[in-house]
Amino acid sequence: MKFAILFGGNSYEHEISIVSAVALKKVINQNLEFIFCDEERRFYHIPSEKMNSKTFSTKAYKKEKELFIQQGGFFSKGFLKENKLECECVINLIHGGDGEDGKIAALFEFYSIKFIGPRLEASVLSFNKELTKLYAKSVGVKTLDYTMLRKGQNSKEKLRFPCIIKPARLGSSIGISIVKDEKDLEYAKDVGFEFDNDLVVEEFKNNIKEYNLAGCVINDKFVFSIIEEPKKKEFLDFEQKYLSFSGHNELIEANLSEELKEKLKDSFKKIYNPLFKGALIRCDFFILDNEVYLNEINPNPGSLANYLFKDFSTTLNTLADQIPLEKMIKINYNFLHSINGQKGKL
């Protein structure tokens, strides 16, 4: 399978997406194409040998061939004709906005481009933490109780401390604050509202444990990664979450009973099916008093969570093989033909 990796985007996680693409290049041992989306949403074809941080930090990528998107794929302008970028499947590796909020999914679906990643509806529901909680509840998966704070509105609801405040529409740990008492609340709100107009507030639980599970559906069967127990801090910050996929953090496989492992997998299945078909996702769960709670859905996890799989390359290739393209509607204009000769025709 010939893959193209799409990365970058107009996102707070733009640089992390670059790191993720470089990391994935080292993991997938096959011929790859690299498509960089800059902050102005222009696409560039990056040669494999130039996939390094300097290419992007110095804006040297602007010297590379610019691509444009149209029906069936990415193209560049040639002397006499347009040249199509040869790839069989695009991996959506844009983290945060653009890649996870539905923009790229809509673009690919519109132009009939085969891709690994969440589709439009899945993107919308997983990118907004409030909608994620509502979706989880609808499929029978628990989440922690929460309160919403809206910019410009005075909430009359009494908050319990300590609490954790998160921007509703950010794909990572950006803008998150742990508030231990009321005197720190206004500052935390100001930080959160810098990134989003809606904030999710949850009671902070000291005795809670976090577990990560990635997977996908291939040929109607679930393929799961190992279950990871992240190193424990108050919460994983931006740098911690994304250095793990580059091999800088020690992977800790969770020491759980078979009963709890099955509970996690069952919750994952409820979240995934059928909404996330065609995507390899990671779900971050909490376990509290032997009950499983969904924390968040990562529809485009860092380097697609390769570090959690025993045979990541086979999983990725097999997933790509079975992704169908949306069937196009055939327009025959029969109705317009039928009224074409009538009096008072359109």
Curated annotation (Swiss-Prot):
Q: Kindly give the NCBIfam families that the UniProt entry links to this protein.
A: D_ala_D_alaTIGR, PRK01966.1-3
Report the record's Gene Ontology biological process terms: cell wall organization; peptidoglycan biosynthetic process; regulation of cell shape
Q: Does the keyword Disulfide bond apply?
A: no
Protein's recorded name: D-alanine--D-alanine ligase
Q: Does the keyword Metal-binding apply?
A: yes
Which GO cellular component does the record give, naming just one? cytoplasm
Positions binding Mg(2+) 2 in this chain are 296, 298
A Pfam family found in this protein is Dala_Dala_lig_N
Catalysis: reaction(s): 2 D-alanine + ATP = D-alanyl-D-alanine + ADP + phosphate + H(+)
| Cofactor list | Mg(2+); Mn(2+)
Q: Where in the cell is it found?
A: Cytoplasm
Q: Which InterPro entries match?
A: ATP-grasp (IPR011761), ATP_grasp_subdomain_1 (IPR013815), D-Ala_lig_Van_CS (IPR000291), D_ala_D_ala (IPR005905), Dala_Dala_lig_C (IPR011095), Dala_Dala_lig_N (IPR011127), PreATP-grasp_dom_sf (IPR016185)
Note on cofactor? Binds 2 magnesium or manganese ions per subunit.
The UniProt record gives the binding positions of Mg(2+) 1 as 284, 296
Question: Which pathway is it part of?
Answer: Cell wall biogenesis; peptidoglycan biosynthesis
